[in-house]
Amino acid sequence: MAYRLTTRRIGMAVFGVAVVAVAIAVQARQSNAVQGAAKVRGNVPGEWRYWGGDAWSTRYSALDQINASNFGSLEVAWQWSANPLGADEYYRTTPLYANGRLFTVATTRRVAAAIDPESGETLWMWRLNEGIRWQKAPRQFAGRGLAYWSDGPNERVIVVTPGYHLAALDAKTGIPDPKFGTNGVVDLMDGLGMPLVPLAVDDSGSLVISDAAPYRQARPGEAWDPVKKIGADGTIGIDPKFGQIANSSPAIVVNDVIVVGNSSIHGYYPIRVRNIPGFIRGFDARTGKQLWKFNLVPQPGEFGAETWQNGSKIGTEGVGKNDAWGTYAADPELDLVYIPVGMPLMDEYGGHRPGNNLFGNSIVAIDVKTGQRKWHFQMVHHDIWDYDTPMSPNLLDVTINGRPRKIVAQTTKQGWVYTFDRVTGEPIWPMPETPVLQSDVPGEKTSPTQPIPSRPAPYSHQGLTEADLIDYTPAIKDSALKLAKACRMGPYFIPASLADGSAPSGLKCSWYAPGASGGVNIDGGAAADPETGMLFVGGQSGLGTIVLQKDPCSEFRYSSPRDSCGLIGALPAPPGYVKREVGSGRSVAVTQIGGVPILKPKQMGGITGYDMTTGDKKWWLPNGGVMRQVTTESPLFAGVTLPPVPAIGGQPQVINTKTLMIYGTGRSGGAGGRRGGGGGAGAAGAAPAQPANQPQLYAIDKATGQQVATVRIPQVNTAVPMTFMHKGKQYIVFAYGQGSNTGLTALTLPAAPAGSRNGGSGDRQ
């Protein structure tokens, strides 16, 4: 009996050891799998080294210390104030976390800073004095973030400044790397084949954002006037006759190559056809040497030049824009970077640029070693809707119809997800070229077809047809139809009309949906779950109108309603010209009856969850998770119970973790930046008292779209959040604020009682 007992005990002991061994082996495999997957995406488990979380721009973290059971218990760990650094339109930056430090940029100066992730104290700050190039930079805001690079012993923070310089800073000290460029800085205006000249501030007339160059070439001997802040201060830059250049998004680092693009002037109200075109360049991450340059407006003789037909001007004397002003994604294993490209100049009229205008409105896959195009796909031909591509695509490895596929999914202003094999560029689901309405504006020649994705279903409303109008009673339908027929109608890609009704249609406006803000735009975009293949799109949906009118004081035959005459760089006004009131070309028609939108409410905008293994739409929820009842005193709606609509507009800003999809409502969702936090730059402090309409962060079940928890936050988030693990604690950090009151808020779980854990397995990664 003793023997048998001993045998049993030995057996149990051996079994117990086996269980432990199996558990350790499984845990090791899971840990290795997590680390391996993160490494493939260019990240380190528990870190956030790219604007989009990783090189694939998944906005995904495998952390789950913060989960459904404790999300509502999150509390403010610290707030970091950027107030002493200057003002900003609104704070649109997503920080990075790497090797124990948090990195951000702030304000129109684009000050780079390292922050202690535990206390919120500033470790270092850096700013480049750019003189006139900063003072008159066309896109001064905080640039959405920065980039990070490390080869092991060396760590660098990569900053693109408002005045268009590229800097490599020691991540530990903030000191520019003396081996990079000149004293740590590369002048990005150099290497473009355009002459650099002394610059001077131009004060010869009124200036409206995005109009002609805000500076000119300096005159011989011209001096700087520190009181009036005009004249020349020694700043060197591209000759202003070529136009304006800037940057509005961080670079991305792929296999020791820094990939950076440019922004041109806004296309709303340009005066000149000629402006700086878009391009992508690669720089050596160690030395700053320019390795290659890819032209997004093909130069004569290059692939795609034939898509700029007779009458189009390309080259340094040609049409501007086609700039890639958004964020980028990359596949380090394939040596490919995926570039979402904007549109050519100008936004609503293209009579000066006949043709499809490559590489405008395209996703372009570029080899980071050579700068050569691997493949491209143009999502909008000859854009006249301001449908530039504003956001990095999302990369996933999924199985479709039993076949492993490496895919790239591009969200757009158009309200569609365009999905491709990221190796070959082949569409995953058909995108047939579909006939669309043609422009009747003199001189305009629109594309006869546009590619329309068959899957996934759109996340934003497109166009306006009779079936889209409210029809709760015959009288309501008649009233809505009367309003709708005042403008040109159609299913999608409806071209602009002339404000004076002189075009053949006789109509004075055209419906515009989605509008210039999308769809998705700079504030929204998608997060991807590499474990399940789900894609979570934070978008918006709406209806507007678009018109054109003659523009005698610009080089364009037509433009959105405005008065160019008298602005810097404008052509002389014609004899007898009467000054016009400045208006908007994107919202000129009535879109409501008695406060009720004429468009039927649909499950669009908000957040849409897609299964990218099938292209199916799995769920939808409104921004903020709340619908509101529409009421009106209009007698037309007497006795009609109107369907609810989302209570919060705008674009949700989404990320996802191992168990949750987490989002903030964005600028539309609450008290904005009206209340601040912290004192000096980088000061950590307690959250101030909050108003009753305090904004929240939301936790969602990724599989079902059901809200599982919320937590109140001091200020509404104004950019995409991020998350990381530091010293065994998971944090969520987001930007807040506008004007002179901006900063970062960090949330974490309360300290656990001695001997207990906060929960979840994320603290082991």
Specify the residue positions occupied by each region the protein language model found.
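Long, low-complexity segments enriched in small/aliphatic residues
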Residues: 329, 450, 454-542, 553, ...
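Acidic, proline/glycine-rich low-complexity intrinsically disordered segments
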Residues: 45-48, 55-56, 82-84, 97-98, ...
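Repeat-blade elements of multi-bladed beta-propeller folds
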Residues: 48-52, 88-111, 137-165, 202, ...
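Asp/Glu-centered strand-loop micro-motifs enriched in Gly/Pro and often flanked by an aromatic residue
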Residues: 61-103, 507-518
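Bacterial N-terminal signal peptides
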Residues: 13-23
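N-terminal pre-domain segments of enzymes
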Residues: 26-65, 448-478, 674-683, 754-765
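N-terminal secretory signal peptides that target proteins for export/translocation
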Residues: 1-7
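Extracytoplasmic/lumenal domain signature
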Residues: 70-83, 112-136, 166-241, 273, ...
